[in-house]
Amino acid sequence: MKAREASVSDDELIVLLADGRKISVPLAWFPRLLHASSDQRQKYELLGDGEGIHWPAIDDDLSVAGLLRAGA
């Protein structure tokens, strides 16, 4: 599975997948993202052609496979 884009609100992480699905998980599961500023949350990079997401300002990484397992 590969991410196409991500967004972070005050209470959830939303990832749009390349196949059209959308993953939405509570931000509380990711303390670094939860405590990051809105600006830090919005500045992410897709890793490995969308297999992961990296937030440089807080040095945090999440894998799409891990998000799918966590949301299952």
Language model: regions and residue ranges:
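Motif-centric detector for short Cys/His coordination patterns
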Residues: M1-A72
